[in-house]
């Protein structure tokens, strides 16, 4: 099914300042999710980064509701007394009836207040509540599915809490309850079944069935309309989970997804079209000077180079100054995350670099947690050898420096033959002998429990990337989350990303994709796909994404082999860039971080909440969406320093300019390119803020004769807007060098 080309509900004219802000004086927001102070997946990042902008809007009327976990409370939560009498009475009432409810402050930016429900302490009511769920919603939950049973307990506790909170308030506030994912969806269904006066929102960050189907190697997007969803869910033994998710989507006043591609998926699998798309953002920390993040890149790259020196000892026959670091990171879903496509493209890239005699070397990291039992001995030995060589060099350097100093002190030139004695040469020879190894550097840094059947390792064996000296592409599989306390690669994830040159995320199923978004915020170019939410968002809002270091791989309309070829082209073009071109591109990439800031994207969540209030309390709130002309779409323009395509830039008559007479130092003529970084940055900042907001909806509330009016955004759901200027025929970096 082709994607719609009409104006998107997440179009960037929404970055304009609103005339009025929402006044939550008599409204309370509860955001309910399984990952509140409980890191499991990407929803944790959404809640953690969004907390500040939501707290700024709602103040002390904003609460997060999640499960109690001992580890999470011990490391992330400061337990407190409830700040209001109503909330204190609510918690006391639930605790007196056999529940365990905790209250505190989540120790993250913004410091939001959290209500934590102890699911395990309420297991005594599981069978009764499962029976009530069956009577109310006709959803049966098998005894062996612990995750689904926890979802039932969490849902009933959440509903109990919301009902008790309303009962303890004499002046009933307008309550908005925002539920994330199916694990919290039971609570939403029960709120509607019990007719609680609550405005409900359900956000799906990925559909259950979509994730399972894509992992099963089916042609997912071309068959969305043809799936028998009940049959597919039943065959995968997730029918009860699917029913929870679908019921929550249909019961909610407002249903949202995180991207246009997921909206299409939800419409066919969950049988409800999302009311609004709420893209995921990040907390963007801007640098006071343009060169600061470039310096951080150099420092982090030096840390990675130290690891590479140790890992490839004995085979370090490539120039580290001409080495590029690529990486892929995320959940270990081999096909969904595109690791299969990345490996195939690396094999083809290796062939291209070898046959063309390139001096560039590529080290590709795979950061995907898998089952291991220990570190690889060879990997540990490599870091020990590197440290030994460093200590030996420092010892010899100190002795050499001392003798040189003494010789110069007496006014004579040193005799170089006497600067080092026999003992020093022996020490250096022993260090050199220690670097000799008979085997290739290891591909995997750990010992895998299922080495023979691991998808990444079996593919590496098939394509033959064994880190040999002849290979221009080296592969390192790190099956563990990065940590600054690791004895192998002692860097955290953020520092690692800053030190790399390119993030590669050729996902087949990626509802949003925080990894390429994090790369963008840190000024690191990345490759995404038109099947990921992030890729669609960038393709929609940027006229020429590749000029800004955002490469969009076509996995929607191309075959798997063609997608591999396109990815290989992207990688090879990137390898051909000069260092100066990469620096300029990183500057452009970092400037796109404004597009991903919660200060802007958080407004789509505001819109969803206002829409829910209008539907739940129509006597007090109104929401009037305006129709939008699709021609009013806005796209972030190409950088002014990027030349247009040759067909558009050719002179109509023979013409010779002063620029043509300037010397061109390299084959690409890079040093003749006039480029003012500060001027470029100023233009891009104006481009973000300049567009006018083409659609408005009023959301007014009346309480006791007073009215509040707020402007919120809405619009028809779609995918890609119409470009405002012609695009060049190609999207690779080759265009930038023409």
Curated annotation (Swiss-Prot):
Regulation of catalytic or functional activity: Allosteric activation by glucose-6-phosphate. Phosphorylation reduces the activity towards UDP-glucose. When in the non-phosphorylated state, glycogen synthase does not require glucose-6-phosphate as an allosteric activator; when phosphorylated it does.
Keyword Chaperone: no
Annotated CDD domains: GT3_GSY2-like (cd03793)
InterPro entries, per the entry: Glycogen_synth
Name of one Pfam family that matches: Glycogen_syn
Cellular component annotations (GO), alphabetically ordered: cytoplasm; cytosol; inclusion body
Segments of skewed composition (Basic and acidic residues): 682-695
Pathway: Glycan biosynthesis; glycogen biosynthesis
Phosphoserine: residues carrying this PTM: 8, 11, 412, 641, 645, 649, 652-653, 657, 672, 698, 709, 711, 728, 732
Keywords: Allosteric enzyme, Glycogen biosynthesis, Glycosyltransferase, Phosphoprotein, Transferase
Region of interest called Disordered, as start-end residue ranges on this chain: 632-738
Post-translational modification: Primed phosphorylation at Ser-657 (site 5) by CSNK2A1 and CSNK2A2 is required for inhibitory phosphorylation at Ser-641 (site 3a), Ser-645 (site 3b), Ser-649 (site 3c) and Ser-653 (site 4) by GSK3A an GSK3B. Phosphorylated at Ser-641 by PASK, leading to inactivation; phosphorylation by PASK is inhibited by glycogen. Phosphorylated at Ser-641 by DYRK2, leading to inactivation. Dephosphorylation at Ser-641 and Ser-645 by PP1 activates the enzyme. Phosphorylation at Ser-8 by AMPK inactivates the enzyme activity.
Biological function: Glycogen synthase participates in the glycogen biosynthetic process along with glycogenin and glycogen branching enzyme. Extends the primer composed of a few glucose units formed by glycogenin by adding new glucose units to it. In this context, glycogen synthase transfers the glycosyl residue from UDP-Glc to the non-reducing end of alpha-1,4-glucan.
Name of the protein in question: Glycogen [starch] synthase, muscle
